[in-house]
Amino acid sequence: MSIQIFNTLKREKQPFKPLKDGEVKMYVCGPTVYNYIHIGNARPIIVFDTVRRYFTYRGYDVKFVSNFTDVDDKLIRAANELKLTVPEVADRFIGAYFDDVDQLNVAKASVNPRVTENMDEIIQMISTLIEKGYAYESAGDVYFQTKKFKDYGKLSGQELSELQHGARVEYNERKQDELDFTLWKAAKPGEIFWESPFGNGRPGWHIECSALAKKYLGDTIDIHAGGQDLVFPHHEDEIAQSEAATGKTFANYWMHNAFLNIDGEKMSKSLGNFITLHDVLKDNDPNVIRFFMLSVHYRKPITLNDAILEDAKNGLERLMIAYQNIDHRIQTDDGEYVEEAHEDEWLEQLTELKQAFEDDMDDDFNTANAITTFHELAKRANIYLAKETVSINVLREFLSMMRLFAEVLGLKLENTQTDSLDDSEVEALIEERLQARNERNFARADEIRDILKEKNIILEDTAQGTRFRRG
């Protein structure tokens, strides 16, 4: 099965066919760095990092570009409030961005271009649009002539006539038409600006991504991605600008993730439920946040609350405990083997699980199903560990496959928070020990007791069941 991608442009799943065999050119819209990013921004960051990881796993060379918008109205306001320059604000929050997403185990982009460091390319694209008759100057501003681009609306599925009828935009006498959008803003007194053939000013938001994608990936790219809120107008405008400037298809596949809601409501400052990723990471394991984000298919809305995060924590712990138990068993292996036929049977099961995982990810990167398959792998690992004798080959294959699944999903299976176990991890091991004793696998039961003893946890077997205390 080839990788299938739901293409927003075509409104259906399509088999992925790269522009060049073995390569993927991918652009993801990055943040405007005037503050810490909110927790909803973390969803596309994690989702499309995982998409990239899977392409890499499948043997593709991925060039992954994600920009920083480091000048716009929000940055200018933040600079005034913080009594800093715009570059100082941008530097502060780009640093904060990397501090936060590094905790989420997000791989570094091939390039993270800043708008302000690529102004020549932006000005050149605007000049090209003017020369081709798609843009016009007006009192120091430059606007894109929307109606001249006949395919406008093809991504969002909106007709120009419908947009005209339903337009709710502030009247601007500088525009020839209310649907025209800004490519270049004339500088206001006291604002940061760049010199250009159109006068001093700075770029509009939409033109930035078009110019950066062209510079770093070329006229046509494989995949352009972002949150569903960017479909219109941002990505629609990007298509218009890029295709008008080059005469070529801008992107072959468009991917968009659904919103993250807080307790069922869309996050917004007006509702008072606006939460930054920075604050969430103060109280939560970033590994759990990543697991949570991947537990629902990226095109479905996802809800964040304490109960759901607790479920994610427990789900991740089950995987971590299975992994750590296998690793411990390998480290203490005494060379016992099962019959060869049984070994082959288990190895065949593992091959089937690997294929199931790939099928899940091939199906529009269905991480929710992939995690279900991951849990099935952990379940079978626990069953195998409960056997009196095991094959070191099978154990190593279990460990290797768990590492493989974790690498694709960007999850960490080692206990990164602390060397100790929390209560739920201890209880899971106690339950496994009870199962081993019921099956008269006393060697495994003693092994679990030893694992807990190493963590300074003492078990007490009573008539009411096994209790534990920390030594």
UniProtKB/Swiss-Prot annotation:
Example GO BP: cysteinyl-tRNA aminoacylation
Residues binding Zn(2+), per UniProt: C29, C209, H234, E238
Assigned GO CC terms: cytoplasm; cytosol
Enzyme class: ligase
Main location: cytoplasm
Protein's cellular compartments: Cytoplasm
Location of the motif 'KMSKS' region: 266-270
Disulfide bonds: none
A Pfam family matched in the record: tRNA-synt_1e
One GO molecular-function entry: cysteine-tRNA ligase activity
Annotated InterPro entries: Cys-tRNA-ligase (IPR015803), Cys-tRNA-synt_Ia_DALR (IPR015273), Cys-tRNA/MSH_ligase (IPR024909), Rossmann-like_a/b/a_fold (IPR014729), tRNA-synt_1_cat_dom (IPR032678), tRNAsynth_Ia_anticodon-bd (IPR009080)
Cofactor note as given: Binds 1 zinc ion per subunit.
Positions annotated to bind ATP: K269
Cofactor: Zn(2+)
EC number: 6.1.1.16
Catalysed transformations (reactions): tRNA(Cys) + L-cysteine + ATP = L-cysteinyl-tRNA(Cys) + AMP + diphosphate
Family: Belongs to the class-I aminoacyl-tRNA synthetase family.
Database matches in NCBIfam families: cysS
Record protein name field: Cysteine--tRNA ligase
Species for this entry: Listeria monocytogenes serovar 1/2a (strain ATCC BAA-679 / EGD-e)
Gene assigned in the entry: cysS
